Amino acid sequence: IIGTPTYAVPTWMVEAYPDVLAETVRGRGIYGTRQNMDITHPVYRYHAEKVIRKLMEVSAHRKCVIGFQLDNETKYYGTAGRNVQLGFVKYLREKFHNDLDTMNHEFGLDYWSNRINAWEDFPDVRGTINGSLGAEFEKYQRSLVEEFLGWQAAIVSEYKREDQFITHNLDFEWRGYSYGVQPDVNHFKCAKHLTMAGTDIYHPTQDHLTGAEIAFGGDLIRCLKNDNYLVLETEA
């Protein structure tokens, strides 16, 4: 199984384009960790597409390659910079058919002078005290993951054979091991872009092993396609 190597950005990219790092509620990220980039950034997307296409050109025809894994445990990594804010406003305009009154009513924005009277005046949602608007923004952020995986799946599909699958290692909330539903990803929507569901399940070991995490993770991932699935990473 060949994985697309897009879950960590190289040093030269950050040096040349520092804004490829995600801007979150804590500000701009600092290079060092993996999975700290803005998955919507056009420069990141440009170079990611180049490396995906090159990888597919040299690997898709090989008989030993049975399938492809898109990225790695993809999430939105808290990205909430200017481009994401503008995308959210566009999303709301489409959702509410450009009707500000309906949107203000839906989210209760007349409270504490939160009312928005012009789309051009839409504030940075990172500072909102409105739980409904904040939840809608997180929903939008989760949709970025779905769009990102769909974008990669479309590229891979241009090269893969009919007998090769497309999967992704969907993960879970983390509390020292896999724990409950992943809050940053809608697994069911992302699975639409996969031909075979996949997951990472990390569990407690030895005296702490109960099987609960394994059973929960397996049940959830099986439901995505109502079929067998791949465990792409697990506790060693």
Language model segments and positions:
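Structural detector of well-ordered beta-strand residues that form the stable sheet scaffold
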Residues: 1-3, 166-167, 198, 231
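Glycine-rich, charge-decorated loop segments at or immediately adjacent to ligand/cofactor-binding or catalytic sites
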Residues: 9-16
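Short acidic/histidine-rich active-site segments
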Residues: 72, 231-234
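Short beta-alpha junction loops
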Residues: 5-9, 235-236
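Non-catalytic, largely sequence-independent nucleic-acid-binding elements associated
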Residues: 217
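Alpha-helix-loop-beta-strand connector modules within alpha/beta enzyme cores
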Residues: 223-224
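Polysaccharide-binding and catalytic clefts of secreted carbohydrate-active enzymes
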Residues: 16-207, 211-214
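Structural motif corresponding to the early beta-alpha repeats
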Residues: 2-7, 38
